[in-house]
């Protein structure tokens, strides 16, 4: 479901808080997703996980915030592990969520999490995140939560409804961030437009070697040429494509040849 730009306007007029009626509407829309997916938000057997993304009228790549795997906590991650019979995937998804949520909503610097991962990989003697197994991510999840406690003096939130409202607030607030303001000024995008928020059931790109994530364009974004263009990563999630930590593959043969 989409929370419209009008709500963004109301959010700022309401001292940067969601109106009470809107919170009820969000809960009702969440129930619709639960019915369609046959999953329940916060459930300990078949948990619904969602993504929370900006929906600005004009694309502002890298300017607005995104949170994936929302709805995971210390209990639902075990339910996800049991449901999918894939412990590594479940723990990898949880650590990603802790990273994104802590950075976007709680304000913990993102590089602090990456440093923990890099140091762990050095200790273990591996190069890639994909070389880490379930027990590795388990240990890093503990380290991540300790980092949040140290930096923000709070425990990482376990209440899934609190997580969702925090993420929606953060996306609205990202419209007013300095980087977004600068981008709008450079690209003549009006400040009063605001952003929408899209809440969607998660589809996973990190469940194994038969899963992937990527971006695609109907035109080449560099040249404007009328040709399909895109790139993807196997066994990854969206942030990996834009973060530059792994080299993506090209979707088309022509792009592969041009890059060679």
Residue ranges of predicted features:
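Nucleotide/phosphate-binding sheet-loop regions of phosphoryl- and nucleotidyl-transfer enzymes
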Residues: 1-260
């Amino acid at each position: 479901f989409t929370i419209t730009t009008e709500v963004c306007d109301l959010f700022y007029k309401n001292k940067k808080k969601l109106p009470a009626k809107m919170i009820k509407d969000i809960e009702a829309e969440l129930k619709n997703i639960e019915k369609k997916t046959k999953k329940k938000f916060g459930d300990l057997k078949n948990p619904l996980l969602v993504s929370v993304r900006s929906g600005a009228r004009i694309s502002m790549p890298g300017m607005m915030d995104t949170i994936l795997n929302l709805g995971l906590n210390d209990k639902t991650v075990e339910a996800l592990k049991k449901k999918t019979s894939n412990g590594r995937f479940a723990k990898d998804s949880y650590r990603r969520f802790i990273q994104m949520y802590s950075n976007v909503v709680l304000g913990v610097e993102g590089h602090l999490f990456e440093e923990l991962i890099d140091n762990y990989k050095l200790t273990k003697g591996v190069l890639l995140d994909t070389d880490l197994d379930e027990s590795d991510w388990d240990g890093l999840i503990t380290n991540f939560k300790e980092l949040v406690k140290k930096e923000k003096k709070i425990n990482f939130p376990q209440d899934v409804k609190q997580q969702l409202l925090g993420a929606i607030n953060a996306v609205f607030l990202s419209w007013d961030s300095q980087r977004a303001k600068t981008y709008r000024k450079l690209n003549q995008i009006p400040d009063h437009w605001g952003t929408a928020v899209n809440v969607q059931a998660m589809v996973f790109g990190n469940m194994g070697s038969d899963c992937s994530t990527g971006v695609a364009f109907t035109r080449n974004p560099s040249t404007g040429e009328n040709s399909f263009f895109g790139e993807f990563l196997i066994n990854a999630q969206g942030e990996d494509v834009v973060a530059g930590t792994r080299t993506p593959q090209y979707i088309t043969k022509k792009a592969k040849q041009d890059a060679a």
